[in-house]
Amino acid sequence: MESIGEGDYENPWSYQGTTFTSDDIDDFFGFVYRITNLQTGKQYIGRKYFTQRRKPRGGKGKRRVTSESDWKKYYGSSPELKADIKDFGKGLFRREIISLHKTLGKTNYEETRQLFLNNVLTESLDDGTPAYYNSNVLGRYYRKDYFESQ
């Protein structure tokens, strides 16, 4: 098996047609992304931050450490999407960054905007099943309100 060099990772995110690496983060806080199942065409839109803040192990008080998040390995939070990735394999999913943002607020806003612009709760594939893995927006609007039980 080929070794993965610095800046390379399995099934990398693409941004504007090129592979996105840690060197491209600059001062961006997070990104909005689309994951597409290349077999079915079903998609997922979400957001991810480049850093995470955690309390150090055994740490006392309010001290927190900032480190790079798991964004390179991240495949979304949808249980349905995760199940399909397990069934189909990571190679059958395209991961693309839609937009990059410098603040938490702008990242969150753009994710919500994209969810509504793409009608993730109401769009369906040719076979009538949901076109998106997203099952809710903001924990307030739900796909189940638009689709019959599957």
What do these predicted ranges mean?
Residues 2-150:
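Structure-specific nucleic-acid interaction/processing domains
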